[in-house]
Regions:
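Membrane-interface micro-motifs in multi-pass membrane enzymes
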Residues: 1-3, 43-50, 101, 162-175, ...
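Transmembrane signal-anchor hairpin modules in multi-pass inner-membrane enzymes, especially those
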Residues: 1-87, 93-96, 100, 122-130, ...
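Alpha-helical transmembrane segments of multi-pass inner-membrane proteins
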Residues: 8-17, 55-57, 82-90, 107-111, ...
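Juxtamembrane membrane-interface segments at transmembrane alpha-helix termini
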Residues: 37-45, 88-91, 112-119, 140-148, ...
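Short aromatic-rich membrane-water interface segments that cap or initiate transmembrane helices
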Residues: 37-41, 158-170, 270-274
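Membrane-interface catalytic loops of GT-C/OST-like multi-pass glycosylation enzymes that act
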Residues: 96, 167, 212-215, 314-318, ...
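Long extracytoplasmic/lumenal interhelical loops at the membrane interface
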Residues: 153, 157, 161, 264-327, ...
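Hydrophobic transmembrane alpha-helices and their immediate junctions
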Residues: 327-372, 393, 398, 403
Length: 441
């Protein structure tokens, strides 16, 4: 049954993406973030994402419905980072395992660049935010209800065979999407939609807490701190956050509190000790190898050479040490520079967007993207999500928002809207005149 529902949807997206590549980008984002085809039977083993990506790339050259590629500091650094990963690939310690991972990352980054060519309007930006919110929010609403129904006794897991399959990764994705849902709440005028989005945000928070991820708890703390600091109503927001926090935490069982309590005693925790050991391995590996070790460095041989404790072979579990171990200090420098620039551009949107009523929505976009990135920066310090799609889609939102602001696109869009309205009114008037001879006296 799922195949019969999802199959026509995928075909329609691919077909429509040929004429309108922006539709293909929305479909690709939906597939890469939510992984819906994994819930079907036969479609789960078919290259659905590749088909939609191929149709989108072909449509990019066939249709004028696009903008010329524009150069920003973010796009330049992203392409340099991609180039550096291509340079480090031949020097990988385990090329056979590194190549599939490199191929996956290149596809994601390529579609990020394509998205910045075919998405340009306010409608595109808001629609992309809706796709992201719906894709992750689906798991948040479902997981939040599950957490409340079970009293937090069980962990919330992500979709299988995806970047966010684990409970920790799922929690970070949920935390990062909450500010994006908050931005969408500002863009809608429907009171019921606003209320529904508030409920979705609360359920996403419940699901993130229910994942029993210690990194997620730290990320929530970082996000709420940024949100509170930026608020004009700090006292009211502080009370609201405390009330909501107490309400959500009251559902958590004793096992949750015991696990969160290990944050302060990380030296006694074997899991934390294994991660620190992996971080030292990545540091020593990068010092000894200028190009890093490639995409697959969680190897016993490498830990034997570079780790303080060679018996604990674990992935880096940190976006920073992951890049450091895989691509060396140059790769880490480019990675940090990329997100530093994205943060700065989001700050510019937040400040400059307040100057005009037409750009006020961009101020909220920049502010919420910064809150989301704060969660990624803190929560990602304990997770291997350096190449996960969601933060790169936030990059797209920020870059497109800056382009819309700098190009004063609201002038063009308002003129286009007025032109369309005039055409509709003229068509209605013409139809009315054509019916007059047949009107009854």
């Amino acid at each position: 049954m799922r195949d019969f529902v999802l199959g026509p949807i995928f075909l329609a997206i691919a077909a429509y993406g040929l004429a309108h590549p922006w539709v293909g980008i929305m479909g690709w984002t939906w597939l890469s973030i939510m992984n819906p085809h994994a819930y079907s039977w036969r479609l789960s083993s078919m290259p659905v994402a590749a088909a939609i990506a191929g149709a989108t790339l072909l449509g990019l050259f066939l249709t004028p419905d696009r903008r010329e590629f524009f150069v920003t500091r973010e796009t330049v650094v992203l392409m340099l980072f991609m180039l550096w990963m291509c340079i480090t690939l031949p020097f990988s310690y385990d090329f056979d395992h590194s190549y599939p991972l490199w191929n996956r990352v290149m596809k994601i980054d390529l579609m990020v660049l394509v998205a910045m060519c075919v998405l340009y309007s306010k409608k595109h930006i808001i629609m992309l935010a809706w796709v992201l919110a719906g894709s992750i929010g689906f798991f948040g609403v479902k997981g939040g209800l599950f957490t409340l129904a079970t009293g937090g006794s069980y962990r919330v897991w992500g979709p299988a065979n995806s970047y966010i399959e684990g409970n920790n990764e799922m929690a970070l994705a949920l935390i990062m999407i909450i500010p994006i849902i908050g931005f969408l709440r500002f863009t809608t005028n429907s009171i019921w939609t606003k209320r529904g989005l508030v409920v979705a945000m609360l359920l996403c928070a419940a699901a993130a807490i229910g994942s029993q991820s210690r990194g997620a708890l730290l990320a929530i703390g970082a996000m709420t701190t940024v949100l509170w600091w930026r608020s004009d109503k700090k006292f009211f927001l502080a009370i609201l956050l405390v009330v909501v926090g107490i309400a959500l935490l009251s559902f958590m069982p004793e096992s949750w509190w015991e696990r969160m309590g290990t944050i302060g005693t990380y030296k006694e925790d074997t899991s934390a000790g294994g991660r620190i050991n992996a971080w030292w391995m990545a540091w020593n590996l990068a010092k000894a190898n200028f190009f890093g070790g490639g995409f697959a460095v969680a190897k016993a041989e490498l830990f034997a050479m570079y780790a303080p404790d060679p018996t604990q072979v674990l992935a880096a579990h940190s976006i920073y040490f992951m890049v450091l171990g895989e691509h060396g200090f140059v790769g880490l420098f480019l990675f940090l520079m990329l997100w530093f620039f994205v943060w700065g551009s989001a700050a510019r949107l937040r400040v400059q967007g307040k100057k005009l009523p037409q750009t006020l929505w961009l101020s909220y976009l920049g502010a919420m993207c910064q809150v989301s990135l704060a969660g990624y920066a803190v929560g990602g310090a304990f997770l291997s999500l350096s190449y996960y799609d969601l933060p790169y889609n936030i990059l797209i939102l920020v870059v497109l928002g800056c382009r819309w602001l700098d190009g004063k696109e609201w002038v063009t869009e308002e003129a286009e809207h007025a032109k369309q309205q005039a055409a509709i009114e003229a068509k209605s008037a013409l139809k009315e005149r054509s019916l007059r001879p047949y009107a009854k006296p």
